[in-house]
Amino acid sequence: MTAQNIDGKAIARAIRTTLSDKVKARKEAGQRIPGLAVILVGLDPASQVYVGSKRKACEEVGFLSQSFDLPDTTSEDDLLALIDRCNEDPAIDGILVQLPLPAHIDSSKVIERIRPDKDVDGFHPYNVGRLAQRIPVLRSCTPMGIMTLIRSTGVDTYGLDAVVVGASNIVGRPMTLELLLAGCTTTTCHRFTKNLEDKVRQADLLVVAVGKPHFIPGDWIKPGAIVIDVGINRLDDGRLVGDVEFDVAAERAAFITPVPGGVGPMTIASLLENTLYAAENYHD
């Protein structure tokens, strides 16, 4: 068996085209253009790349993108004050604060300062709580994008044994909630998990998000499984690889996401979807 690649680039491109058409229709109807505020604190190279991609995607679909690039010496109070201004700005539908933040800034306090109706990253406890209560509105972008990828396979998720490796607030925990909502029997594995191999081998649907190259050996993959690799790791030779040993896993899985070109583009596409949702449902 050779797995079918789940092409995140193509799916994200189709989403952006749909969003662009909707923005054009709004303009023609005399409605406001959706707006996204993107806040970057410091000069972390990876964060600068991610933020640049998000700003470019905003412009491609016709959103208004407001950029705030702050020095890493910015105080927590100054950052919170900026968020307050964005919260009250009627031209802004979504606020994105690029993580991680400098050590002197409490990221939890920053996330909670963003108004839930402008929390297009889906990190605010209110929005995570709604997902847990099975009434989601603004969903965490990476898990939301992953669910779009899974749906693209045409596989019925109800009753699948799903395993999530990684329990971060950004991916692992909301991913578990999304899979429960999709009817899976879900196991979440983390650093205290015993017998990880046994659990992975049982997975009809595997999502790995740990940030360690080739953390999951390919021969652990259950034949016919769906494998979603969230990791993106740069090796010493410059290659980008995921958290799963791709070449071996691809010989066993039915569907697998490549790295790069799998999950990454979908995170940005979901951010754009959330921003339009906020504009249409909260701010029009």
UniProtKB/Swiss-Prot annotation:
Keywords: Amino-acid biosynthesis, Histidine biosynthesis, Hydrolase, Methionine biosynthesis, Multifunctional enzyme, NADP, One-carbon metabolism, Oxidoreductase, Purine biosynthesis. NADP(+) binds at G166, A167, S168, I232. It catalyses: (6R)-5,10-methylene-5,6,7,8-tetrahydrofolate + NADP(+) = (6R)-5,10-methenyltetrahydrofolate + NADPH; (6R)-5,10-methenyltetrahydrofolate + H2O = (6R)-10-formyltetrahydrofolate + H(+). Pfam families: THF_DHG_CYH (PF00763), THF_DHG_CYH_C (PF02882). Its EC number is 1.5.1.5, 3.5.4.9. One of its GO terms (cellular component) is cytosol. SUPFAM superfamilies: Aminoacid dehydrogenase-like, N-terminal domain, NAD(P)-binding Rossmann-fold domains. GO terms for biological process: L-histidine biosynthetic process; methionine biosynthetic process; purine nucleotide biosynthetic process; tetrahydrofolate interconversion. Homodimer. Belongs to the tetrahydrofolate dehydrogenase/cyclohydrolase family. NCBIfam families: PRK10792.1 (NF008058), PRK14186.1 (NF010783). This is Bifunctional protein FolD. It comes from Shewanella amazonensis (strain ATCC BAA-1098 / SB2B).
